[in-house]
Structure formats: C-alpha cells, structure tokens
C-alpha cells in the first residue's frame, strides 16, 4: 500500500475548505442582499474572521414562521476601546429585508441580542456587526420558513388591544454590580404587519407595530432598536447591561401610530428584578 503524504493531504484538505468557503460566499450573494448592501453599506467591505466577532443562531427549519427564535452572540465583551456599535438584522426574502437595527454601547457589557422574528419565505438571515471603528462583520444562517409576515396576528385582537403597551422587565438571578447582567424586556403588542388578510371580511388589517425601543440604566442608554413588523407579535428582547451602582432600568417604546409606552424597575445589588 502506498503511504499517504501528510503534506499533500493537508494541502488537498485546505483546497477543499477554501472551495467550500468560496461556494458558500457566492451562495449567500443574493440579488436582494446586493441591493440592501449597496443601499446601506455602499463602498464598505466586510472583514474576514466574522466568527471571532459575531455568531447567529437560528433553526434550520422553523416550527412557526411567525415566531422564529434567534440569538445574536458577540464573541467578545464590550470594552471602551473595542465594542460593537450596531447590529443590523437582515432577512433577504422578507417584505422589509432590513428588519432591525440595534445600537449598543460599552455599558451593554455584552452585545448579545435574543428575540423572535417573522420570516416570509426560505431565506438567508444576516446579523451584521458594525464596530466602533466602522469595520463590518457578518454572520449568516439559512432558515426554511414561509408565511410568517402574512400570518394573522393572535385570534383575540380585542384582548390584544386592551393589553397594548403593557411591558415587563425580568433579570436572571441576583444582579451583580460591575458585571454584564442578562435582562429581558417583554412588550404586549400585536405588531400587526398589514400583510395578513382577514378570512371573514377579506380585508387587510392596517399595520401597527413597534418602531423604536430604548433601554437605559441610570440615565445611560444600554440598548436601542429601530424595528418593524419583522419582530414577532408581543416583542421580546433579551440583552445585557452593566449596572455600576443601584439604579433604575427603564424602557421607552414608540409604535407606528406614535403611541408611547414606558416601564421601569429598580435595580438593587444581589436582588432579581421584575416590573
């Protein structure tokens, strides 16, 4: 039997990996993405090594296209000298491909964002990190889902409107000062896309959805978001913040009808929070 040359084997494996990466890069270059990139990131390039900056978790096939869980994970913590300034969420095949733009600061501690989204058709989902120095890094996942944006909202719209704008904060365990703490913001809102037909009246319900979210701690912004109906009914966001001392965690939300909602919770070292 002829001995296998380890150098040739390594070279062959490297060529296979490079070819696979090139094929994947071409595969993700859809016409819609090219238009979004030219409109939002014209003249800017994407840096290599994105998996050392940002990752994206999403199911390969969604159980419910109107409620698809995603987790955007920042590999490194937020430091004043190097941090993720913005995260762009793009779903190529959605009616509104640029579904969300999250703005973060060093006071976020970590730039992780977890939420639930609607996906209208089989699509590439993209999480793009913009660093404080302007460099761009992109993570992608292909998700098989259909009909999420045109699916009707909850069955009882009257009850949903009665709860409109009610919000609640929750933290996991006792809050640790000077450390990134995970918090969750739950918003009661039908987030009507305007794309779902009423099967009885055959009419489309007018759109009404959350447009902006701003979360601050002790008066300093830790996370803000410009969003649309890409976010699922009853928007839910999990994010981090770093409390330097006891203070107030506050959320201000505005929807597409210019209705404004607020909630806040007192944060005390060692105690959990729930508003």
Outline where the language-model segments fall:
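N-terminal edge beta-strand
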Residues: 38-65, 159-177
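Bacterial N-terminal signal peptides that target proteins for export
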Residues: 1-11
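Aromatic sugar-binding surface patches on proteins
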Residues: 107-114, 229-238
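Extracellular Ig-like/FN3 beta-sandwich strand-entry sites
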Residues: 120-124, 180, 244-248
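Short edge beta-strand/loop segments characteristic of extracellular beta-sandwich folds
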Residues: 57, 69-78, 182-190, 198-203
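Low-complexity, Pro/Ser/Thr- and charge-rich linker/hinge segments at domain boundaries
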Residues: 27-32, 147-168, 270-275
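Sec/Tat signal peptide C-region and signal peptidase I cleavage site
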Residues: 20-25
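Short acidic/polar inter-strand loop motif in beta-rich domains
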Residues: 131-138, 254-263
